[in-house]
């Protein structure tokens, strides 16, 4: 055991030395870029500031004073360059540390695969899903208790707006590309050999140096939403389905009789729905953001379906397919000329044809979003237009069941299972959009709608009685009635009307909850319930108690 411990410590020290070397190499590359673009004097100042800062951290008063004097003497242009140099340096350090963690994880996974099953190296990594499952089993959790536990798992991660976030998506994309170059450089056998050229890293650093760090104009709400969606597009859609797969794998190994949970991890967002204190979050903005969410989900799903259709080329001459697959295929065979062409080209590949038809429907849904006005009363109300998430899920389930019933059970895993996980997590809406408004706005709107100028002065009991009576007879308002209302009341009702349209056209999964800021009484919730009835919305109401 002692020898093993010493070996692990030695390995850890070597790994940390590799990280330090990577950081020094990146710092050197940054220095060369600064020298080439700004000149050697700028780099000399960077090094002086760095040296003084390190000394001042050890308590050197003279160094601290010199640091302050040096910074005070900088011109605005040189001060900007120094700020850029240190900002970019720490971004590079962050990239190196992230890559270091990824490298460690990969090494540990590889070591686990090659280790003796009885050795310590074969144990799952700490904080992994399998590690948690094993710990629960060791604590005596039986199958029935485990089934109840996983059935009750419900995790929703919520994105919120941060108006102070100034980093542009352009910079995020550049940093991501640089991170990929560093990863490829660390493993040249598996990647692009051109990335091994040090000049490749320096070109990326130079591009970052010469790119504006901040937006020229203040970001609009839709820009904030696009920045949030960037993380979905670049990382989450690719990574999160693996968590579902990890859960299934861990349960299969350690609790084979326990059924893995479905849809236990989802996302929500406040960006584009939180109008408390932000007049820029209008109903039109909410509709736009819902469209952005929907479009990304449809495009991601469409791409995955196309890839799957190219791989799931099982021939019905080699393997029988279920009647359910035949029925779905019959219903969609004449969806378009393209599907008819696929049918004539691949007449004996039913899964490919069925997925091709689904891809066609996803493409039509994307075109509908691109056309705009999908969440308006003027949009065409074609019953065949909406593409329900459940219809997509049913197609995947039918294909999976057909494969498992025959000799293609292996094909029901892999890409098909991953696309099912993707749908479970993101649906066809990416993230549920929560709506939020201050209770005072609801109170003012209700006062106008009930024609009670004294409404705010009523005591709680009187408000409840009045609202209960109003709720009993409330019906959705028509266009004529809405047109007569004040702008402030329309600002309260219109987002709810958009929510009702989104639930109808995108499905209820597109919306999350309705949050009431500064809730202090039951009447605050009854007011929102009344407003929901007037607009046809049906969001769960979540009171937010604040001080």
List PLM regions with ranges.
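Active-site beta-loop-alpha junctions enriched in small/polar residues
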Residues: 272, 435, 516-519, 544-547
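Core mixed alpha/beta domains of very large multi-subunit molecular machines
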Residues: 442-446, 453-542
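Often metal-dependent polyanion-binding catalytic scaffolds in large enzymes
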Residues: 1-470, 488-491, 539
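Alpha-helix N-cap recognition
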Residues: 388-391, 521, 547
């Amino acid at each position: 055991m002692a020898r093993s411990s010493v070996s692990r410590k030695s390995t850890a020290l070597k790994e940390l030395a590799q990280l330090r070397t990577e950081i020094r190499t990146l710092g050197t590359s940054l220095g060369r870029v600064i020298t080439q673009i700004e000149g050697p004097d700028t780099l000399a100042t960077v090094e002086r500031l760095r040296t003084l800062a390190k000394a001042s951290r050890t308590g050197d008063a003279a160094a601290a004073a010199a640091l302050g004097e040096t910074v005070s003497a900088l011109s605005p242009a040189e001060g900007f360059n120094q700020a850029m140099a240190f900002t970019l340096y720490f971004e590079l350090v962050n990239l190196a540390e992230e890559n270091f963690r990824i490298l460690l994880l990969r090494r540990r996974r590889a070591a686990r695969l090659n280790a003796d099953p009885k050795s310590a190296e074969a144990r799952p990594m700490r904080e992994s899903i399998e590690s948690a499952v094993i710990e629960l089993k060791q604590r005596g959790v039986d199958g029935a208790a485990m089934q109840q536990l996983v059935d009750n798992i419900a995790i929703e991660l919520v994105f919120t707006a941060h108006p102070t976030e100034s980093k542009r998506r352009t910079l995020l994309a550049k940093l991501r590309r640089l991170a990929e170059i560093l990863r490829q450089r660390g493993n040249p056998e598996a990647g692009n050999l051109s990335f091994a050229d040090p000049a490749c890293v320096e070109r990326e650093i130079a591009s970052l140096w010469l790119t504006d760090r901040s937006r020229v104009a203040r970001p609009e709400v839709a820009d904030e939403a696009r920045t949030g969606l960037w993380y979905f597009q670049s990382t989450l859609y690719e990574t999160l389905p693996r968590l579902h797969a990890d859960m299934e794998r861990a349960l299969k190994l350690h609790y084979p009789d326990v059924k893995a949970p479905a849809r236990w991890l989802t996302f929500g967002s406040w960006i584009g729905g939180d109008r408390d204190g932000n007049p820029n979050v209008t109903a039109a903005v909410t509709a736009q953001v819902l469209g952005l969410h929907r479009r990304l989900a449809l495009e991601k799903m469409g791409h995955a379906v196309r890839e799957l259709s190219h791989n799931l080329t099982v021939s019905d001459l080699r393997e029988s397919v279920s009647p359910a697959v035949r029925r779905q295929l019959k219903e969609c065979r004449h969806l378009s000329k393209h599907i008819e062409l696929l049918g004539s080209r691949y007449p004996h590949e039913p899964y490919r044809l069925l997925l091709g038809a689904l891809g066609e429907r996803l493409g039509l849904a994307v075109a509908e979003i691109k056309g705009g006005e999908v969440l308006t009363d003027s949009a065409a109300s074609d019953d065949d237009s909406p593409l329900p998430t459940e219809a997509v899920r049913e197609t995947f389930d039918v294909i999976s069941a057909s494969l498992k019933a025959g000799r293609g059970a292996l094909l029901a895993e892999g890409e098909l299972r991953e696309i099912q996980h993707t749908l479970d997590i993101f649906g066809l809406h990416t993230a549920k959009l929560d709506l939020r408004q201050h209770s005072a706005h609801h109170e003012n709107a209700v006062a106008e709608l009930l024609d009670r100028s004294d409404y705010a002065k009523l005591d709680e009991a009187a408000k409840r009685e009045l609202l209960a009576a109003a709720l009993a007879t409330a019906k959705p308002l028509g266009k004529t009635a809405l047109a007569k209302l004040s702008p402030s009341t329309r600002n309260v009702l219109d987002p709810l009307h958009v929510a009702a349209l989104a639930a109808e056209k995108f499905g209820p999964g597109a919306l999350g909850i309705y949050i009431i800021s500064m809730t202090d009484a039951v009447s605050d919730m009854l007011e929102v319930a009344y407003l929901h009835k007037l607009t046809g919305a049906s969001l769960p109401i979540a009171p937010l108690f604040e001080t």
